[in-house]
Amino acid sequence: MEEDDQRRSERILIDLPLVVRGESAKDNGIFREETFTLTISAHGALVMLENKVSLGQKIILVNPTNSDEREGKVSYVGPDRAGLAKVGVEFLRPAPEFWQIGSAPPNWHLPGAGQSSR
């Protein structure tokens, strides 16, 4: 089975502005970082971060276009490249409406879409 077939919701490759708030894994200080997405889905996003975070850490994602806030959990931290790392964030609950995009994939709105294991 293809990996995309196993996903809970389709990923969209898109650069959207985003604000991330949380606690820095480096010095335990609170951070607020303006950044952008690489991919989004109904279940989270892949973003670029300068601040250091840890797997499992809870952070807040803020959509600056409407000030909507969602809590998420860090599910992936890539290697640091030029001071930035790719960070995967999973919403605690699916939130397809968070992204405010015009043409969301059909599986973002299927009943039970958030129920599978991936």
PLM region descriptions:
Residues 1-118:
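Structured alpha-helical
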